[in-house]
Amino acid sequence: MASPITPPRGMRDFLPAEKARREHALGVIRRSFSAHGFDEIETPVAEDVARLHAGLGGDNEKLAFSVLKRGLSGDDLRAAIESGDTLSLCDLGLRFDLTVPLARFFASHRAELSPVFRSLQIAPVWRAERPQKGRYRQFVQCDIDIVGEASQLAEAELITATAATLDALGLKDCTIRVNDRRILNALLQHCGFAEARWPRALISIDKLDKIGAEGVVAELSEGAADAAAALGGVLAGFEPHLADGGVELTAQAILRILPAGVDTAAIGELETLAHALGALPTGVRLRFDPKLVRGMGYYTGVIFEIAHPGSGSSVGGGGRYDGMIGRFLGTEVPACGFSIGFERVVDLIELPESAGPDSVVLVYDPAMPIGRLLAIKSDLAAAGRRVRLDRRAKNLKAVLDRAAAAGFRSFAFVDADTPAVALDLKPLTEL
């Protein structure tokens, strides 16, 4: 039987035209974030499995791809299965985000980095998702992080840089939804949840759009029925205020929708942040969304997420995670990050289809000496043109149509008598 020739489920091949479109978008993102002072780094695709399963990744830890240790025996496998500790069979795992690797990177290289480090990472990550439209097992994230800055300057810089990047990509009608983990914790305390139950409650609230308030209550009722019922009432009370993506980022608007008695310190900080940001690019707006959670367990303060009407899910998000890096260093290090979900963004924006105005196809005579053909091609490439060779065939129209479909703008026929200069370039658009 023939071997499968399709990619693994949830993973994709990209043909040249699509790859070029993606690289164009990535170039826009790189240039924009670089202009805001972020330095690009690279980390391995795999990390120690214990680090990836340290309880900070939320539900994503359950989706991590793990790598078996070398040299395992059948007895090792049976013992692990019988004990239920199959993770002990693994020593590495593929990264499921870029934040956990960044924390390890900063802890490892702290002495070589500036006290406030602005990081840019653009790289694939892997999660064992159930593949569906817009959700893949391998996908690219574009992360910016500021490590070492405790003030709201970090959040303000991240939101400003991300808003400018969305604008540079031409993505309009974006809403940056904002919340704070401290407000969420205060809500859970107000409803009567013991602190030990907060992480589980946050995971359930994060699924609110999928399972509804009744589903959240059902998940949390065991051992905390009264608290779960109170939370269900609070969540239901939010709905009339969220039709526009949330409420204005002002203390007055936020307090109007929260239950009385919720700690207000974080609310004042959100209003201060909104004032600091000032006017964002046209097509990007800020809103407070009290049910925004962000599923990762490492967030400690302000959290944010990008919503767009053309996407059924968020197209980016992030927040403050002051406690993570301290796990590696034994001392607290403030950190905050923002990630653009590239796969969802690239489907929403208009990108150029062509190879560029300086792209040319040389349709060559098969009898032409190779050295002569390469000399002509090299001269054009040295002059800054993108050059492709295509053999002249009986069906010349098919050759030229293929070149036009690939985005090439012009062509020339070449043979042994063609001069190296003054090629007769013809526009493909006139065919």
From Swiss-Prot:
Q: Where in the cell is it found?
A: Cytoplasm
Give the enzyme's main class according to its UniProt record, as a single word.
Answer: ligase
**Reaction(s) catalyzed by this protein?**
tRNA(His) + L-histidine + ATP = L-histidyl-tRNA(His) + AMP + diphosphate + H(+)
From which domain of life does this come? Bacteria
User: An example of a Gene Ontology BP annotation on this entry?
Assistant: histidyl-tRNA aminoacylation
Q: Which UniProt keywords apply?
A: Aminoacyl-tRNA synthetase, ATP-binding, Cytoplasm, Ligase, Nucleotide-binding, Protein biosynthesis
Q: Does the keyword ATP-binding apply?
A: yes
Subunit record text: Homodimer.
Its family remark reads: Belongs to the class-II aminoacyl-tRNA synthetase family.
Name the chain's protein.
Histidine--tRNA ligase
Source organism per entry reads Leifsonia xyli subsp. xyli (strain CTCB07)
The root-end lineage is: Bacteria, Bacillati, Actinomycetota, Actinomycetes, Micrococcales
